[in-house]
């Protein structure tokens, strides 16, 4: 189940290659995958999701974030979000939580207020507390 974070961004847990065509029908123009390959047995690989995205005419970025979130993760996430521009972006990880938090930290770097990020992330059912120390004021 996807959660809307802002007018351009959807967050969800793991998807399958077969789900990508439906995302294209919903107007998604960029998929950002925050799962490292091999995180769980049987999960689709980045290459499998990328192939499905390309076949559906969707841009794809693999921004794997394992335990913790460092400056290079934040910068890669920002770059991917900037590449999406004003298009509709679908970001996923195992549950959606890591993606929501990575999105929030990246958007904080772009000047989005802590209050606005809390509203967006909280409205999707996630909590900013684990990354509050990374957010700009």
Language model: regions and residue ranges:
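Short cysteine clusters
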Residues: 93
